[in-house]
Every structure is written in structure tokens, then in C-alpha cells.
Amino acid sequence: MATSHLLAAASSTAASSATFRPPLLSLRSPPPSSLRLNRRRHFQVVRAAETDKETKANAPEKAPAGGSSFNQLLGIKGAKQENDIWKIRLQLTKPVTWPPLVWGVLCGAAASGNFHWTVEDVAKSIVCMIMSGPCLTGYTQTINDWYDRDIDAINEPYRPIPSGAISENEVITQIWALLLAGLGLGALLDVWAGHDFPIIFYLAVGGSLLSYIYSAPPLKLKQNGWIGNFALGASYIGLPWWAGQALFGTLTPDIVVLTSLYSIAGLGIAIVNDFKSVEGDRALGLQSLPVAFGMETAKWICVGAIDITQLSVAGYLFSSGKPYYALALLGLTIPQVVFQFQYFLKDPVKYDVKYQASAQPFFVLGLLVTALATSH
């Protein structure tokens, strides 16, 4: 639930190119596809065009030479242009953004203290992971691309939607199919777990709504760097954790507070992905933190959110009488700081992939340490 997450309504970092759009009834209306300047105002606004022909006309027919089929399947930059509609559909869901949601479910199950390595519990967790990852994160990423066509037309104009590789009806069908599948699995898990109150279903609904308003006007949370990135962090960390814990145990207020705090670290991780989109964000008037504060200040906001959050959680664990877990989390935070100075703070655009590949394994292990600590 990612959103992202869960429920996606998740994340992403998630990956080096991933991200999360007015009420679902408005999905039939074409998304913004042209950028116009309002001469009576001093700022840029995005207005919906009557058709998507302008974007398609300006988009190159082919992706850059040397594109990778593997990147295409993962939904990241450097993808090879594909004609197979199912590969294109998969690309829109950005599978590279699913693992954080899957990991969040795992952490929630561990934090419940009631997960057992039985066939039934493993099956429940797998269904919850499918709901959170492929279904609801896939929904989140597809609807994000749908409403993000103008940015993609600037940053990656050869992506499936701005290039016209997939039709409007096909995109809308995919959005609805993934959303309904995710909500259906949420309802199934509530019945399977014997819940009197359908908490997982409502988490799925909440995550899906969060994903929607993240990218879609009139709210379009992503226009605000603080609110948008926190929503992204909550979707990729808090929501899947809550779903996993609710599936096997009880979702308590202290866990909600702790995971919400961890979502601040998710905010920092989300900022990492904003640096490479500065040109498109600035052109469309999106106030990402690198645009609003400048690259140098945004770098320190990013690492500060990640590091201070983990140190705060370690302090909480220590004060709760769990010093060994606190020391383990502290030990996992130190390598992240080292990689921040080695890669990210030097050049967040050039080294973003190296930094995330090096530092994020320690971050996600820290999540598991925290989950295990709260289960005892």
C-alpha cells in the first residue's frame, strides 16, 4: 500500500526513477499534456489540453540507442523501446519500486510477534505482498505516469505514455484493474484473518487515495516538496508495515507513531530522486525541495531527514530498555553516513544510483531491526 505504496499507496525511493494522481471519477478526463504560461500571473500553471496530440508530436519516436531490455522491465531510465503491450504495461508499474513495499509487509509481520513459518501464514504474507507491490504500487506508478506526462515529455519523452506507445484507454483500464485487484485482495485478507473490522481493506483504500491525490490535481501533493515527499515516505514505509502487522496481530498506537517517524526518513529518501528531475520540475512549477531551496541546501535536508530519524528511533529503543537493538540500529546508520559523504553529498545527480545501492540495504535492515525490537 503505497502506496505507494502500500499500498503504495509507497518509496520510492524506490528507485532511481520512480514516483506516484482528482477523484477517481475524473480518470476519464485527459491529463495535463501541454504547458502554457498565464500572462496575467507571474507563475507557471499546468493546464489540460483538449487532446494529447501535442505531447505525442513533440516526443521522439525512439528511445536513445543502447537501451536495456532489463531496465525496460524494471521501469527505470535507460529502457529499450518496446512494442509488446504487456511489457509496456509492466514497465508502467515500475517493478523496481515494489521491493520496499514487500519489505514493509515483512517488517509488519515480524513486529506483530505472531507470524509463524506455517504454510498458511506464509501464504497470507505473500498475498499481502502482492496487494502492496504489484497491485497497489503498480496502480500508484501507472497513475503517476498518467498525470506526469508533461514532466516525462521533458525528462523522458520516449516513455510509453508521452510517446504514444500505449493508448489512453489501455492506461485507464490498467489503472482500474490494478486498483480493484488491490482492494479485492485487501478485503480477502480481512476475511482470511477473521477481522471484525476490515482494517486492511481500509488501509488499501487510504493508500490508494493518498497515491491519487499525490499526483492528481487539484491537490497534487507532489507540487509541495515537504508534503509530497512525506506522503511518499509514509506510503512506502508506514502503510505496508501497518498492513503486515494488522494481518497477524494488532496495530497499536505506538507502532503508528514509530512508523510515522520512520516515514520522515522516507521523505529524505524520496528527495534523492528529485535531484535528477530539477529541470522538468522547474519548468512545470513543481516546488520540489531542490527547486525550492537549491541543490546544496536540499542535499543536507535529505541526509538530515534520513540520519536524524534513525538516530531518534535508536534513542527510543534504548529508552525502552532495548539497548542491543538500539546499538544494532546505530551500527547500521553509520555506513549510510559514510556513503552519503562518499557519494551523495559530492554529486547527488551523478552518484544517486551508487549511493542508493550502497546505503539503502543498511536502511532496510534497520527497519527490520526496529520491527524485531517492537515484537518483544
Swiss-Prot record:
Signal peptide (from-to):
none
GO biological-process terms attached to the record: chlorophyll biosynthetic process
Q: Where in the cell is it found?
A: Plastid, Chloroplast membrane
Keyword Cell wall biogenesis/degradation found: no
Here the transit peptide covers 1-47
The record ties this protein, via Pfam families, to: UbiA
From the Swiss-Prot or TrEMBL record, give the protein name.
Chlorophyll synthase, chloroplastic
Question: Which species is listed as the source?
Answer: Oryza sativa subsp. japonica
